Design a protein with these regions (language model features):
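Active-site gating/metal-coordination segments in enzymes
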Residues: 1-45, 101, 106-111
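Distinct, well-ordered alpha-helical segments
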Residues: 30-34, 58-72, 89-96
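Divalent metal-coordination and catalytic microenvironments
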Residues: 44, 102, 139, 175, ...
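Glycine-enriched alpha-helix->loop->beta-strand junction motifs that scaffold or abut catalytic
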Residues: 47-50, 69-77, 94-103, 132
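Catalytic beta/alpha-barrel core
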Residues: 50-56, 77-85
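Active-site glycine- and acidic-residue-rich loops that bind
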Residues: 80-86, 105-123
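Short acidic/histidine-rich active-site segments
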Residues: 105-106, 130-151
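Mid-to-C-terminal alpha-helical segments outside catalytic/metal-binding sites
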Residues: 156-188
Length: 188
């Protein structure tokens, strides 16, 4: 990881700007996954690069943060992915309280969790003044997600979900915090 940050990826001059996506299994962190988290923490501590994690079905985010924190990682430099796949507000609030960012990044995957419920959780976070710790994105992971194959496509977040947020009472400033300002701050 450190070599890809400092020297370049696969012999190129392209250098990694983030340590990602390190993940855990549903409901547990296996010994091998723990090794990867420790390696990511070492790379972060040496390079200062931010870390992005993967949770399986919105589980183990708090445990991921505890593991990284035990290795000396500044949790304000960590974003926990896939926090929006179930009713998870209590854990999201705890992760934010620890200083981490949370990602609502499976937008459009209504077969896992409906966007209406994602919007309700975002309202709860906005009402608490916590949008400054939330990032929005999409997890396009299969060809079936592409428009050419009948999926919702890469533009769904901007053309469908953001208008739904706006109609539900979010301001453009709220949206900009989650789409622009937070990612910019995270990468500084």
């Amino acid at each position: 990881m450190i070599d890809e940050i400092e020297q370049g990826i696969d012999g190129t001059e392209l250098k990694a700007g983030i340590i990602a996506e390190i993940g855990s299994s549903e409901g547990k962190i296996t010994p091998l996954e723990e090794k990867v988290f420790i390696a990511a923490a070492l790379a972060h501590n040496q390079t200062g690069r931010p870390i992005s994690t993967h949770t399986s079905f919105s589980t183990m985010g708090l445990e991921q943060l505890a593991l990284l924190q035990a290795q000396g990682v500044d949790l304000s430099r960590v974003t926990v992915g896939h926090c929006d796949l179930k009713d998870n507000l209590d854990n999201i609030l705890k992760m934010i309280d620890l200083g981490a960012y949370v990602q609502f990044d499976t937008i459009g995957k209504n077969s896992y969790y409906p966007d209406e419920k994602r919007i309700a959780m975002l309202h709860a976070l906005r009402d608490r003044g916590l949008l400054n710790r939330v990032m929005l994105s999409m997890d396009i992971t299969r060809r079936s997600h592409l428009k050419a194959n009948g999926g919702y496509g890469y533009d769904f977040l901007l053309t469908t979900f953001i208008p739904q947020l706006r109609q539900s009472g979010f301001s453009q400033a709220d949206v900009d915090v989650m789409l622009r300002e937070n990612p910019s701050q995270f990468f500084q």
